[in-house]
Amino acid sequence: MDQINVLINKLIYDTMNNITSLMLAVSNYEIHDNYDTVKSLIDCGFDVNAVDKHGKSVLMYAINIDSDKNINVIKLLIDHGADVNHVDSYQRSVLIHTCMYMEYGYNNKTISLLIDKGANINYICNGKNILMMIHKYLSEETFQEVFHLINNKIDINYNRSGIIRENILMRIIKKLDNKYSITTIKLLLEHGINIDHINIYGQTALMYACIYINGLKNIPIIKLLLEYGANINSKCTKGWSPLMSVFKNDIIDIKTIKFLVEKGAEINSKNCKNETMLYVFCKKLSTRIYGQACVKIFDFLIKKGISIDNPNDKGYTPLMAFIIKISEYNEYTEKFIKLLLDYGANINSKDIHGSSILNKVCCDVVSGSVSHCKIEIINTLIKYGADVNSTTLDHKTILMNLRYSIHSENYITVLEILLRNGANPNIYDEKYHKFPLLIDILNRGGELRIIKLMLQYNIDPNIVDNIGNNALLFVAKHYKKNERFSFLKLLLTYGASYNCVNKKGKSFSDYVLDKEVEYYSRTITNLSKDNRIMKNVIDSIPIKVPEKIYCLESFKMKIIRFKWNLCNRIDYDDEAIMNYLGTNDPVRLIQIIDESIKYDH
């Protein structure tokens, strides 16, 4: 009973979908030899061009997976007038139906038969012609069909009307995976395919070979394309040349680069962002694992005369591109930096906003947007001469730019590195800056340890803001009772003047509460008696002092060296200095020198 129901349902389905007995017979080849059945039905008058509800013809029913086994039935239908160019309701031709099963390696004989019988090889379905449909299944068998299509003058220069507009040459290069792909490329070139065809991005087949074919496999293709006239210095819409396109590849091989350069590729070509190949390479290195092979590429490009310091349209140099985006510090990182510097890269170059490499890296670290490896980069940059006091176009030093992130966990680490290496915390211009650095940090709620560190490295608490407040007045005026004691004492300890009067005529005493007067009076009295309070200031003199702060041959530096000799009990018999300072007592000499340096800014 169940079998009867199945048969009834199938009969109803076939009737509703206009499926004829001939359609069923031609598609039944996998069960038994259906040739005689098909011939009998044709002889009985069944229409070989009948179509079902979806416009699928009898010939299309005969074509399925491995329809080469049904080749005799297909020939029979064609011999009896089956239309080899019929198109179904989905705009698929008979030949398109045949190509749909090429993925499984079938239907090669069927394709040849249809072509020989007049099937339109240039029919377009969904933006593709037949060649574009079967090229991705290239093998020993399918290559014969490609050869057959080309010899029958299929339009090899057709380019898909879709989004990218690639031609068949580009598509084969993009998927190149066996020797038949290379043979097909050569066949297309021999038959005159347009080697200069560009997609919507302006990319050529040569650029595709540089981008998509990994490693040494691309050299034979590149060589072949150049032999047929490919322009080695063409540019896409973004200005990338084939040589620059190599660096879009997942595998960058120096032999490919050398080959292109030897064939005349312009080594200093720039893209639309004014980026050179070296810039692109440096940027690529920042986001991938690199090693000795990349050092060799660096060395080759530099020795070939590539521009070392050419900035892009944002003012970024190759060195900046490498350093700013780097995510890993390994044994080759410093080698790359040194190699660029040795050949003329400027470690203090700035972008269009006046921001130096060191400024950018320091700001990245304190903002928490990068890994810990950037701390190593900061030390390396300073080691090779990065200016710790460089300023941006808005007259801000690195220390000033960092103040926006004083609550970052990395802030104090970076701050100490900069101060230890000579960053001047006292640079201030009332015309451009509202607050001196110390007052600005206090205004932003800087921790006591930050203030102490800056005072230890000689920041001047007596530089006043635009209304005349020094750091002591600022804290006394704005800090609440429960948080200001430790700050005020620290500032007094490091020489903040309690006699400072602001533009409103207010001094420290005006902001001290009545019940605080006795405490601060006693504190000031005790500090004035202590000759040792400035020792922690001078002990923190930067290990590397900028020339614009202290000239090494100046009398001030001689005094500082004299003080160090005193502290280390080295011979300090310098009559000129002792006469100048008016004493030969070691303790008093140290005190006078400390006070002299502290109040000079």
UniProtKB/Swiss-Prot annotation:
Source organism: Acanthamoeba polyphaga mimivirus
SUPFAM superfamilies xrefs: Ankyrin repeat
InterPro entries to which the protein is assigned, alphabetical: Ankyrin_rpt (IPR002110), Ankyrin_rpt-contain_sf (IPR036770), Multifunctional_regulatory (IPR050745)
ANK repeat locations: 17-50, 54-86, 91-123, 165-197, 201-234, 238-269, 274-310, 314-349, 361-390, 397-427, 432-463, 467-500
Gene3D superfamilies referenced in this protein's UniProt entry, alphabetically: Ankyrin repeat-containing domain
Keyword Lipoprotein: no
Keyword Repeat listed: yes
Keyword list, A-Z: ANK repeat, Repeat
Tree of life domain: Viruses
Protein name: Putative ankyrin repeat protein R841
Disulphide linkage map: none
